[in-house]
């Protein structure tokens, strides 16, 4: 794997978190994370975040919490999709680039050509990508090979046959002959890219997948279509849908989308949510970017993560993340 971005913990994986923090498997904030304290100097300017739709609500919560300490800061959050973050960072038209996936080599190369060094991808939260069905759907679980056979036209994961109907998954009665209505994201979305790589084994989506403009729209579509299936971040779950337990391979036990299984690495579609940063090695960040990252990776900022339905990072991860942009942990 090309490690051309300056990423902090993605190389060791989310499972490594279980050994570096004191939160265990619960969705709790690591008590070793300090409470954010206002900086002594002046912090002002425009805080503009361009990128992930999945992270849109979360980034807005961070900005809102940050402004309580620095009311003069102006904020703007544009959730256009993760693909919009790298060019905005490269061109200098944003302060941070939220992304729900890693940068592609071509995106990193474009940044390096302009600036002479790679961007930094700071892990700021943990997400579980979920497969949703209608709340009345009795499906017990899916292997990733079955997910691939449902959503992909290639079946790169090794499934012998295409899965088209609920009966193909063993459902009886009213479900048996009903086609599975598929909902997903478009190609600008980091969620689309992550699902394509990890659930479709880098295969191609079927043309019958109905692309939605955002994560919330996918969940709403599944909630209103009894015979639907869709994928989105776990933070968009509502009472009108069910999250399907997943197995990493055929014949393995189904794993619930539970925080303890994200931390342990047992849930097969866990991922980091990143803030992309333009940081020249050996230099100090300006006060606005420095303090925003300190807030995000504090107990306050990780409280926002939990509030929005995602999983907080540990103090050890936060310390390494801050160090990657030259910030000493409190």
Predicted regions and their residues:
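Bacterial N-terminal signal peptides that target proteins for export
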Residues: 2-12
